[in-house]
């Protein structure tokens, strides 16, 4: 049977021209009847070349890089899984630090250089046994399991607890529980009890056993409600700053005001920075347009002793009070143009 084999090449294979030739030679020695295809990772992932799913018995990955640089993306791993047939193999230069991704994509790790696409196992569903029927004289009867019957407690027998088994006696704990329930009913606190047992209440009790909610509200009005004091001074003026334990809401108002001021300042600074950037760009553009060009006469050395020749500031011969910081005549007395000045 012909085996379909795919050579999946990493782009760095071009660094060694003998790698692919050696792999093909090994394949020809180990396989008698095979059909070999070859492509690169980038062409496969970009869709430049397409293969049918479940079309390859083996995919060989060639990556000459070191182990820490052999990572395979999940998208490529899933694509390789789809191209392999059932029980197909993915071999070659595989990464060793992606075991979780390999298992999540459906592969089984056989060894360090081989992953396998397993064949799914058939699931076995256990069917429920149907109810048996007996036929007697064309009369069909279905055998059904009977459930135990329980006796419901009546209001007349509320003083004694109802038992499902007449042979069981009444324990001390059950007696105490029944007496506590009876006390709750007498004190009209059943409405507030969190007992989920509906045996004692079957919906037939009168409304007198329940407490009216309006009565509870009326009773709560008797208690004095604590109202927080306003942050006001004795003279009637309002406080400029909230107290340490403020409860009137002034502290929250101050915090909101501080936040609004901060946002306003951030907006102003951002606008200023933006305008400064725009102005700097305009200045730079103007400087590029107005280029300063010096002639040969401007670039030649200036002799301050010759009449008509002056420095850039034109004040070198007037004295130190008029000379620049880097003037070579600093410290010398004033001189006239044409006068010989020597600097020792």
UniProtKB/Swiss-Prot annotation:
The gene is DRE2. Keywords: 2Fe-2S, 4Fe-4S, Cytoplasm, Iron, Iron-sulfur, Metal-binding, Mitochondrion. InterPro entries: Anamorsin, CIAPIN1, Dre2_N. A motif (Cx2C motif 2) lies at residues 324-327. Its main location: cytoplasm. Residues 154-179 are annotated as: Disordered. The C-terminal domain binds 2 Fe-S clusters but is otherwise mostly in an intrinsically disordered conformation. Monomer. Interacts with TAH18. Interacts with MIA40. Its cofactor is [2Fe-2S] cluster; [4Fe-4S] cluster. It comes from the Eukaryota. It is found in: Cytoplasm; Mitochondrion intermembrane space. A motif (Cx2C motif 1) lies at residues 313-316. The keyword DNA damage does not apply. Residues 231-248 are annotated as: Fe-S binding site A. Component of the cytosolic iron-sulfur (Fe-S) protein assembly (CIA) machinery required for the maturation of extramitochondrial Fe-S proteins. Part of an electron transfer chain functioning in an early step of cytosolic Fe-S biogenesis, facilitating the de novo assembly of a [4Fe-4S] cluster on the scaffold complex CFD1-NBP35. Electrons are transferred to DRE2 from NADPH via the FAD- and FMN-containing protein TAH18. GO terms for biological process: cellular response to oxidative stress; iron-sulfur cluster assembly; negative regulation of hydrogen peroxide-mediated programmed cell death; negative regulation of nitric oxide biosynthetic process. GO terms for cellular component: cytosolic [4Fe-4S] assembly targeting complex; mitochondrial intermembrane space. This is Fe-S cluster assembly protein DRE2. Residues 313-327 are annotated as: Fe-S binding site B. It comes from Candida tropicalis (strain ATCC MYA-3404 / T1).
